[in-house]
Every structure is written in C-alpha cells, then in structure tokens.
Amino acid sequence: MLTVCWFLYLVRTADNALYTGITTDVGRRFLEHQTGKGAKALRGKGELSLAFSAPVGERSLALKMEYRIKQLTKRQKERLVAGDGSFEALYESLQTPPVKRD
C-alpha cells in the first residue's frame, strides 16, 4: 500500500497574519488559496505568500501538529517560520510515545 506524505504549511497574508494548514500537495493547495478556492479564512486577504512548509508524514501526525501550531502565539509562529528549531522540537515531542504510568 502506498503511503501518502502529509505536509504542514503556513501562509502569510497581506496584513502579516499567519494561516496554518495541512495538505498532501503544498503547491496545489497554495494555488487554491491564491485563487480563492482554498480556506474561506484566506479569501479577500490580499496577496498571500507561503511562509513555511515541512513534511510531517502521516495524516494523524499532521493533524496533531496543525492543532498544536494553531495554539501558538503569533510570536511563537514567527520563530517557527524563522527556523529557530521549535518545529523540530514539536515534531519530536509528538513522535515520542506517551509515558506509561503505573
């Protein structure tokens, strides 16, 4: 069975807001956002730019990462986009199985 790789991405709007999403094809999804066929949250937001994208693997992990990143402050998202290592740390924290407690 073919495994599909999911990506997490952040889009920057004209007013400098960051939108977080997941997809299996970043180029296609970004084009959908640019042409008004993507998320309603980005429609009418002016010029869009792809600020960040990274492969995360399976869909379940991509959904977890998307949720966690959407919980971050704008400053924390900006650091992630700048490549401060926070994406890698978050990725690793979600890869580690939970500790079983007695």
Swiss-Prot record:
Protein family (similarity comment): Belongs to the UPF0213 family.
A UniProt-annotated Pfam family: GIY-YIG
Species for this entry: Enterobacter sp. (strain 638)
Name under which the protein is recorded: UPF0213 protein Ent638_3592
UniProt signal peptide: none
Domain named GIY-YIG: residues: 4-79
Superkingdom in the source lineage: Bacteria
